[in-house]
């Protein structure tokens, strides 16, 4: 355990006693170092190690602690003012820094300090919360929300109105993760630490939480909390045990490999689900 992690872990145990007025200098410095590290991409709340996603709980704890040590203050916006404990990521950015970091931010997009945005990312009028990581080449479309500590892979498209759940409110054990080369259709929601593995296509209006049945129509298998790599998923329903009613589920209608995903358009994949 690093010294930084040790300070965070110890502070979290006494978090109820920490306020902006009582926090000691060493604890404040450690928390701010973590937030800066998350902001720059040095730290990630979750990362893939030996093929498995690992959550660094101490980083999440630092994010939670950051709310304990800061007072609300005025935040200036172009059209209004805000009043919050967390600064905005781009408050001090110059044109040169935007150009250097290599992403686009459309007016009304909001990113909190402590979120990392990779090169070649486009942020339409959307919201990215503290602790989140957005991978290279990703499009966060209009009114999409990337929740606190959520992990978004490379070359992902989060369509209009998509919601990717956070870990802070309500408190979740693990962040929601969207793998590389995924497409999440408009108004879909992926929450509660669900993992969408690489190369998945999620149709419009699909809602997936930890208790959602994810039914593979080819195998009959039911998954919880994980969408297998290469899945094409639509909303559906499954009959109850007594056959009297149906309950919502997500349905894996087919699997595609990276080569097929690269060659075939998203609309074609979704329109051919009856094949």
Curated annotation (Swiss-Prot):
Query: Acetylation as a keyword?
Result: no
**Quick one: a GO biological-process term for this protein?**
diaminopimelate biosynthetic process
Q: Where in the cell is it found?
A: Cytoplasm
Q: GO CC: one term?
A: cytoplasm
Gene3D superfamilies (UniProt xref) = Hexapeptide repeat proteins, Tetrahydrodipicolinate-N-succinyltransferase, N-terminal domain
The organism sits in which domain of life? Bacteria
Q: What pathway, per the record?
A: Amino-acid biosynthesis; L-lysine biosynthesis via DAP pathway; LL-2,6-diaminopimelate from (S)-tetrahydrodipicolinate (succinylase route): step 1/3
Keywords for the protein's UniProt record, in alphabetical order = Acyltransferase, Amino-acid biosynthesis, Cytoplasm, Diaminopimelate biosynthesis, Lysine biosynthesis, Repeat, Transferase
SUPFAM superfamilies for the chain: Trimeric LpxA-like enzymes (SSF51161)
Q: Which family does it belong to?
A: Belongs to the transferase hexapeptide repeat family.
Fill in the subunit field for this protein: Homotrimer.
Keyword Amino-acid biosynthesis listed? The answer is yes
Intrachain disulfide bonds: none
Entry's Pfam families? Hexapep_2, THDPS_N_2
**Which species is the source of this protein?**
Actinobacillus succinogenes (strain ATCC 55618 / DSM 22257 / CCUG 43843 / 130Z)
Question: For substrate, which residues are the binding ones?
Answer: 104, 141
Q: Which gene encodes it?
A: dapD
EC numbers? 2.3.1.117
The molecular function terms of the Gene Ontology recorded here are: 2,3,4,5-tetrahydropyridine-2,6-dicarboxylate N-succinyltransferase activity; nucleotidyltransferase activity
Query: In the record, what lineage is assigned to the organism producing the protein?
Result: Bacteria, Pseudomonadati, Pseudomonadota, Gammaproteobacteria, Pasteurellales
Instruction: Enumerate the InterPro entries for this protein.
Output: DapD_Trfase_Hexpep_rpt_fam, Hexapep, Hexapep_transf_CS, THP_succinylTrfase_dom1, THP_succinylTrfase_N_sf, Trimer_LpxA-like_sf
Q: What is this protein called?
A: 2,3,4,5-tetrahydropyridine-2,6-dicarboxylate N-succinyltransferase
Q: Which reaction does it catalyse?
A: (S)-2,3,4,5-tetrahydrodipicolinate + succinyl-CoA + H2O = (S)-2-succinylamino-6-oxoheptanedioate + CoA
């Amino acid at each position: 355990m690093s010294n930084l992690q040790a300070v965070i872990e110890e502070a979290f145990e006494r978090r109820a006693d920490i306020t902006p007025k009582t926090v000691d200098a060493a604890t404040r410095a450690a928390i701010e170092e973590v937030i800066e590290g998350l902001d720059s991409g040095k730290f990630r709340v979750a990362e893939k190690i030996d093929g498995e996603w690992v959550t660094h709980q101490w980083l999440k704890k630092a994010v939670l602690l950051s709310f304990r040590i800061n007072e609300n203050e005025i935040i200036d916006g172009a059209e209004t003012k805000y009043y919050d404990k967390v600064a905005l990521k781009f408050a001090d950015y110059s044109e040169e820094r935007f150009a250097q970091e290599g992403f686009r931010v459309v007016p009304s997009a909001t990113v909190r300090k402590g979120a990392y945005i990779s090169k070649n990312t486009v942020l339409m009028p959307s919201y990215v919360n503290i602790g989140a990581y957005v991978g290279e080449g990703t499009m966060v479309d209009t009114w999409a929300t990337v929740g606190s500590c959520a992990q978004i892979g490379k070359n992902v498209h989060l369509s209009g109105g998509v919601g990717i759940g956070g870990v802070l409110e309500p408190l979740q054990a693990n962040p929601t993760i969207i793998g590389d080369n995924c497409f999440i259709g408009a108004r879909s929601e992926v929450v509660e630490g669900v993992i969408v593995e690489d190369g998945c296509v999620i149709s419009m209006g699909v809602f997936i939480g930890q208790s959602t049945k994810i039914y593979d129509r080819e195998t009959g298998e039911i998954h919880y909390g994980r969408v297998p790599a290469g899945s094409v998923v639509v909303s559906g329903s499954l009959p109850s045990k007594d056959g009297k009613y149906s309950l919502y589920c997500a349905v894996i209608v087919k699997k595609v490999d990276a080569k097929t995903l690269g060659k075939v358009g998203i609309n074609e994949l979704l329109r051919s689900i009856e094949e």
